[in-house]
């Protein structure tokens, strides 16, 4: 009986140890680079992203570069009505002004939801999804205007 409890305990602990949102990010604000390869080693990096300036909310996500653009993606249930909390993806849809920290630098960017089927499909297929599932929310970062 004890041997059956260990896998359940491990799963429970793993689920409880998810990313914990934080508040405002600190660091030097810099203009967005001409090419994200100037600041990201390879094609991906862990980024800290702050949104909702009136009530700052920050999280860590894997950012990735594709065709020169910087992206992030949600899990496939981020906007599901049954999801127990308001996901960062829902927050960004309402408040797209973000601050992205990579290393010590902060870039003030706009998180643009990618809904065009061709771009969304190509980016998520390059991430290994075959077929590309519904529900994943994809954002491309753009300079603020």
Where do the PLM segments sit?
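Short beta-strand segments
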Residues: 43-80
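Short, structured beta-strand-loop surface elements
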Residues: 56-58, 77-145
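C-terminal motif of bacterial Sec signal peptides marking the signal peptidase cleavage site
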Residues: 13-16
């Amino acid at each position: 009986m004890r041997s059956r409890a260990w896998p359940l305990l491990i799963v429970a602990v793993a689920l409880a140890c998810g990313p914990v949102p934080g508040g405002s990010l600190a660091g030097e604000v810099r203009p967005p680079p001409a090419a994200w390869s100037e600041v990201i080693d390879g094609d991906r990096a862990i980024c800290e992203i702050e949104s909702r300036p009136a009530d700052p909310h920050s999280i860590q996500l894997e950012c990735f570069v594709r065709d020169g653009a910087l992206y992030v993606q949600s899990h496939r249930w981020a906007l599901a009505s049954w999801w127990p909390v308001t996901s960062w993806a829902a927050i960004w849809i309402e408040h797209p002004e973000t601050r992205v920290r990579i290393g010590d630098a902060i870039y003030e960017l706009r998180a643009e939801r990618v809904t065009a089927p061709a771009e969304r499909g190509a980016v998520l297929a390059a991430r290994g999804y075959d077929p590309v599932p519904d529900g994943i929310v994809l954002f491309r970062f753009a300079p603020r205007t």
